[in-house]
């Protein structure tokens, strides 16, 4: 198979519907040199064909990143495989989902395991890691600039008290935000956070590369914070958007109350999904005026097809 590092190669493995109650969800990443990413992708594909997993793993020359779900045995199998491959310093977190959180199992080959679009070296240059207690102490200070490195729709579901929203739609836009909004604050303490920690590996590396002096980030990201921090000690407000069928999680990494608008992808609170503007898979208050009636008709057709497919499987 020919491979260009600028291309995305995606291979799928079949996933059977799990009969057991609940799914173990494992979020993981590690920046580590991978000599032959295409070979690792193929061996991962061979493995996941033999176990019941769903989710996505991204393989690149700089490491591995992804979230997968399955039964206990399947998760332990993929975890041990990666450990045997030398990924023994993974940022690794587990949670649970009552429903199947992903439709398929994907193994993707990419240039970056998280796409910033600017060359940085997080294995060599990265911000100061803080555990949840240290994080609370830092962001309570008045001389700290607290930045949410996630995208606008993620910020909408929840964030830390006092955090700045860069209003980015993709992580690729973050370097431009730094150039326009942070350049004059190189002498300030900068604290950044993201869902699982991987985006902050690159964002803190970027800032240090650009000459910022005091750059901090939350080790393990929001997910680790919600797992370890009691609600009465937490500075988190709202829910944490996740890229799977749960939409968002809250303290204890328990499934939250938000649902996702499948037309635009934005998270909705129970109050927002009760509004007349919400039609499942068709519209919500954030997108109802941004699509045509023809597009809405197409969305309704898609929902009918999905419902028919589900009925056929029963």
UniProtKB/Swiss-Prot annotation:
Keywords: Oxidoreductase, tRNA processing
Top-level taxon of the source organism: Bacteria
Recorded catalytic activity of this chain's protein: uridine(34) in tRNA + AH2 + O2 = 5-hydroxyuridine(34) in tRNA + A + H2O
PROSITE patterns listed in its UniProt record: RHODANESE_3
MF-aspect GO terms: oxidoreductase activity, acting on paired donors, with incorporation or reduction of molecular oxygen
SMART domains listed in its UniProt record: RHOD
Top-tier EC class: oxidoreductase
EC number per UniProt: 1.14.-.-
Active site: 194
PANTHER family, per the entry: RHODANESE-LIKE DOMAIN-CONTAINING PROTEIN 7-RELATED (PTHR43268:SF3), THIOSULFATE SULFURTRANSFERASE/RHODANESE-LIKE DOMAIN-CONTAINING PROTEIN 2 (PTHR43268)
Similarity section: Belongs to the TrhO family.
Job description of the protein: Catalyzes oxygen-dependent 5-hydroxyuridine (ho5U) modification at position 34 in tRNAs.
Classification via NCBIfam families: PRK00142.1-4
Protein's name according to its UniProt entry: tRNA uridine(34) hydroxylase
Naturally occurring in which organism (per UniProt): Acinetobacter baumannii (strain SDF)
Gene it is expressed from: trhO
